[in-house]
């Protein structure tokens, strides 16, 4: 059976969208569509696992730690050392948030690797919402610590040459940068997770369309890429969390930086 490239692409995307719309509970309130679909189910599952992992870890501390407590303590140490105080020790107070964000995204990424699940972080609406939350926290912390006027003035160096001309230009470029940060956060996580799952799906779909002989090539490639996706799941969660911490601290210490 011969299948054109266009037909294969259409079938893959159709199957991907069908998976997203599975398990739907249709719900509409005041004309607003609040239907619960597959991404929402797995988002709730990821949030529940993250909460239980951290709650149980905090409630079961012992003088003689078991394996679970050791894991929790090592994660806490990892978050304190890797996320806390990227620019200044005062910024360390935000590492619990960054660590929680890392664990949450890692859980969602790993869940998405299981058969018949859904990779929530491959949904641009979810990653954009998280990135928007980071943007709001960043601006809030910058204004709270420095004051609105001082924070906005810090967006361009005070000692620029030809200041009347260069200061507005540099300030405007920094304004664009502030909006670019959440955009790149959202797109980086979304694109990396979506691309990885689509590649695995394509490799396995080749068996259905071109017959069993292609399995000898498709399956090994899919397995190797699946293992690589585990690494991607970890690194993308880490990148999102560490950049969130850095952006918040850059806003906190904006005046000192200039």
From Swiss-Prot:
InterPro entries: ATP_syn_F0_a_bact/chloroplast, ATP_synth_F0_asu, ATP_synth_F0_asu_AS, F0_ATP_A_sf. It is a multi-pass membrane protein. GO terms for biological process: proton motive force-driven plasma membrane ATP synthesis. Gene3D superfamilies: ATP synthase, F0 complex, subunit A (1.20.120.220). Pfam families: ATP-synt_A. Its main location: membrane. The chain crosses the membrane at residues 38-58, 94-114, 118-138, 193-213, 215-235. CDD domains: ATP-synt_Fo_a_6 (cd00310). GO terms for molecular function: proton-transporting ATP synthase activity, rotational mechanism. F-type ATPases have 2 components, CF(1) - the catalytic core - and CF(0) - the membrane proton channel. CF(1) has five subunits: alpha(3), beta(3), gamma(1), delta(1), epsilon(1). CF(0) has three main subunits: a(1), b(2) and c(9-12). The alpha and beta chains form an alternating ring which encloses part of the gamma chain. CF(1) is attached to CF(0) by a central stalk formed by the gamma and epsilon chains, while a peripheral stalk is formed by the delta and b chains. This is ATP synthase subunit a. It comes from Rubrobacter xylanophilus (strain DSM 9941 / JCM 11954 / NBRC 16129 / PRD-1). The lineage of its organism: Bacteria, Bacillati, Actinomycetota, Rubrobacteria, Rubrobacterales.
């Amino acid at each position: 059976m011969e299948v054109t490239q266009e037909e294969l692409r259409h079938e893959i995307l159709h199957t991907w969208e069908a998976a997203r719309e599975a398990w739907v509970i249709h719900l509409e309130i005041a004309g607003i569509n609040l239907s619960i679909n597959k991404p929402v189910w797995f988002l709730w599952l990821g949030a529940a696992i993250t909460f239980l992992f951290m709650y149980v870890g905090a409630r079961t501390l012992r003088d003689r730690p078991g394996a679970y407590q050791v894991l929790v303590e090592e994660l806490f140490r990892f978050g304190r050392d890797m996320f806390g105080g990227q620019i200044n020790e005062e910024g360390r107070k935000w590492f619990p948030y960054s660590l929680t964000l890392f664990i949450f995204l890692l859980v969602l990424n790993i869940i998405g690797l299981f058969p018949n699940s859904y990779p929530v972080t491959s949904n641009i609406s979810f990653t954009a919402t998280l990135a928007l939350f980071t943007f709001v926290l960043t601006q809030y912390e910058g204004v709270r610590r420095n004051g609105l006027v001082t924070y906005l003035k810090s967006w361009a160096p005070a000692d620029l040459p030809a200041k009347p001309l260069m200061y507005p230009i540099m300030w405007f470029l920094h304004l664009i940068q502030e909006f670019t940060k959440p955009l790149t956060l959202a797109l980086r996580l979304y694109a990396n997770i979506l691309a990885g799952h689509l590649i695995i799906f394509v490799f396995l779909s080749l068996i259905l369309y071109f017959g069993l002989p292609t399995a000898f090539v498709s399956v090994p490639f899919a397995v190797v890429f699946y293992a690589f996706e585990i690494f991607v799941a970890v690194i993308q969660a880490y990148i999102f969390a560490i950049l969130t911490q850095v952006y918040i601290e850059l806003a906190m210490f904006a005046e000192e930086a200039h």
